[in-house]
């Protein structure tokens, strides 16, 4: 099948705000420096829902969503030397070409080699590999994992341990790595520090896990859904706070509870008001707040400049700061050696035909991550 078009099932988003539709699509063979992957498992993330809602300024339709997947290489295009058919892989929405000025700078993981075309839903040559009912279907985040087969750039693939369970490690393609790395790489949480994590979805729980791994002595979990508190404590939170239980702003509550504020805070929701609260909950002189959640298009953050003048730092992170191609295999190895939790994030497993139910579960707040077996 290496040089042939493959017909397979995919969940197509024909337009914004409508449920996904399981369709038979055609997947063209990989061109030069591309890889065709058989996807075995994918998770559903808030970013997929954000794009499907129509709020994403880069959202284009019709499209095959999905960016937390894992599978096996089916075939490779001309010039691909780092991968071969049969390799176990995780597709990456942030590539690592190793050559652009971003890849060569140790301060960032934001490879820009294919950013322009990826943002338009196209492969690096400006075309798509997907068609359905005679129409071109766009790619998503360079990955499109809601399909039995997908085609990605060879710089957007991490080769991983072939014994890793794909229905678990697919989560390392986004959420877990993002939260975990926000604590370890972006904030660089230190032993004995006090941390606050706002938002206890998958990313927030992973941030708690990262704070614990870094040796934080106090980890305060903040959410308006108290049903999430027990799980937060399982991941390492030392205490949990519901802002709705207080008559004053949550940042004031945290400053009082922590003798002046936390050393590190993490906003894992994408709410600009919470981003402000997370910054203002930080300790004067050295507190660091990391924006992890993605806010809606056009939204802006605000605070009094005095908050920054007096020594607080506001930072942002994408994919937890991990340089993807080199880091994801290491994260999989850490999971295999039980250094990081992954299984505990999977609260539901569904069949491909039930993919719309996965979105419903996520919106209900009752699941952390739902894995869809393709």
Swiss-Prot record:
Quote the record's binding site residues for Zn(2+) 2: 97, 100, 103, 111
Annotated signal sequence range:
none
- Keyword terms: Acetylation, Cytoplasm, Lipid metabolism, Metal-binding, NAD, Oxidoreductase, Phosphoprotein, Zinc
Q: What InterPro entries does the entry give? A: ADH-like_C, ADH-like_N, ADH_3, ADH_Zn_CS, GroES-like_sf, NAD(P)-bd_dom_sf, PKS_ER
Tell me which residues are marked as the site Important for FDH activity and activation by fatty acids.
115
**Pfam families with a match to the protein in the record:** ADH_N, ADH_zinc_N
Q: Which domain of life is it from?
A: Eukaryota
Q: List residues, modification Phosphoserine.
A: 247, 324, 351
Q: What is the catalytic activity of this protein? A: a primary alcohol + NAD(+) = an aldehyde + NADH + H(+); a secondary alcohol + NAD(+) = a ketone + NADH + H(+); S-(hydroxymethyl)glutathione + NADP(+) = S-formylglutathione + NADPH + H(+); S-(hydroxymethyl)glutathione + NAD(+) = S-formylglutathione + NADH + H(+)
Q: Where in the cell is it found?
A: Cytoplasm
Per the record, residues carrying N-acetylalanine are 2
Task: State the EC number(s).
Answer: 1.1.1.1, 1.1.1.-, 1.1.1.284
Q: Where does Zn(2+) 1 bind?
A: 45, 67, 174
Where does the record place the modification N6-succinyllysine? Answer: 233, 315
Tell whether Electron transport is among the UniProt keywords.
no
Give the cofactor note.
Binds 2 Zn(2+) ions per subunit.
Its family? Belongs to the zinc-containing alcohol dehydrogenase family. Class-III subfamily.
How does this polypeptide assemble, per the annotation? Homodimer.
Q: Per its record, how is this protein called by name?
A: Alcohol dehydrogenase class-3
Q: Organism classification, top ranks?
A: Eukaryota, Metazoa, Chordata, Craniata, Vertebrata
